[in-house]
């Protein structure tokens, strides 16, 4: 699978990420021009977590983000559908669980906060995944989605599209272990809803107080929400 227009098969998605796992962190830093570190910091700050909180880091990949979340003093678990990604991060000392975002292996109301970064695009049924995140979050608990989005400035959006569709694939061929995965990345970003569209999906999944904030000119957006009380 390389085109975002194809139906997402969960096992094909997992296999694609297994194939890029070995050089995933380096590739992300290179292709994002170092912005990935900034995006992780902002995601952690938006969650507002601390000691005593239980946090699910979904689509955690190699658990780089989970380690940074755990620095807050919260208990954090990394979950990902790609066993290869989790294995590539085995040196990182946080709990790791392999699981499908639409069928999470956790009990109801297990977490105070849930976050997913750059993974919701790859979930076969986005709303079902968001509903499952709500199921495992306690009432009043928090959600933060960090995902690629739509630049707000038209001129910048044009430059970004050129980078996404032309420069990024060339750079991926130089540094990535599976360049086709980054062709899929570019196409999946183009097919993804804008900030308001994603907010509507989050609300449709039962979350409340949905709001968003743009990062890097709207290349990325942080959507935050709260699970309503019973």
Swiss-Prot record:
Domain of life the protein comes from: Bacteria
Single GO MF annotation: demethylmenaquinone methyltransferase activity
UniProtKB keywords: Menaquinone biosynthesis, Methyltransferase, S-adenosyl-L-methionine, Transferase
Reported function: Methyltransferase required for the conversion of demethylmenaquinol (DMKH2) to menaquinol (MKH2).
Catalytic activity from the UniProt record: a 2-demethylmenaquinol + S-adenosyl-L-methionine = a menaquinol + S-adenosyl-L-homocysteine + H(+)
Protein name as annotated: Demethylmenaquinone methyltransferase
Binding residues annotated for S-adenosyl-L-methionine, in chain numbering: 62, 80, 100-101, 117
InterPro entries linked to this entry: SAM-dependent_MTases_sf (IPR029063), UbiE/COQ5_MeTrFase (IPR004033), UbiE/COQ5_MeTrFase_CS (IPR023576)
Higher taxonomy: Bacteria, Bacillati, Actinomycetota, Actinomycetes, Mycobacteriales
Record keyword S-adenosyl-L-methionine present: yes
PANTHER family per UniProt: 2-METHOXY-6-POLYPRENYL-1,4-BENZOQUINOL METHYLASE, MITOCHONDRIAL, METHYLTRANSFERASE
Gene3D superfamilies assigned to the protein according to its UniProt record, in alphabetical order: Vaccinia Virus protein VP39
Gene, per the UniProt record: menG
Entry-linked HAMAP family: MenG_UbiE_methyltr (MF_01813)
Family: Belongs to the class I-like SAM-binding methyltransferase superfamily. MenG/UbiE family.
Natural source organism: Mycobacterium sp. (strain KMS)
EC number(s) per entry: 2.1.1.163
Pfam families: Ubie_methyltran
One GO-annotated biological process of the protein: methylation
UniProt pathway annotation: Quinol/quinone metabolism; menaquinone biosynthesis; menaquinol from 1,4-dihydroxy-2-naphthoate: step 2/2
């Amino acid at each position: 699978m390389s085109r975002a227009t194809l139906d997402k098969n969960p096992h094909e998605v997992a296999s694609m990420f297994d194939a890029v796992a070995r050089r995933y962190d380096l590739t992300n830093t290179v292709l994002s021009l170092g912005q990935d570190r900034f995006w992780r910091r902002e995601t952690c700050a938006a969650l507002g977590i601390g000691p005593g909180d239980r946090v699910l880091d979904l689509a955690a990949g190699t658990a780089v983000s989970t380690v940074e979340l755990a620095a807050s003093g919260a208990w954090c678990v990394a979950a990902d559908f790609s066993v290869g990604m989790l294995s590539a991060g085995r040196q990182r000392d946080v709990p790791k669980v392999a699981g499908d975002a639409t069928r999470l292996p956790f009990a109801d109301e297990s977490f105070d906060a849930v976050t997913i970064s750059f993974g919701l695009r790859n979930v076969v049924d986005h709303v079902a995944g968001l509903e499952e995140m709500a199921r495992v979050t306690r009432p009043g608990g928090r959600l933060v989605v960090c995902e690629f989005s739509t630049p707000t400035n038209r001129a910048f959006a044009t430059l970004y599209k050129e980078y996404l569709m032309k420069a990024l694939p060339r750079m991926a061929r130089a540094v990535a272990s599976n360049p086709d995965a980054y062709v899929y990345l570019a196409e999946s970003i183009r097919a993804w809803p804008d900030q308001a569209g994603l907010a509507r999906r989050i609300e449709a999944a039962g979350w409340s107080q949905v709001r968003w904030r743009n990062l890097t000119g709207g290349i990325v957006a942080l959507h935050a929400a709260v699970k309503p009380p019973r």
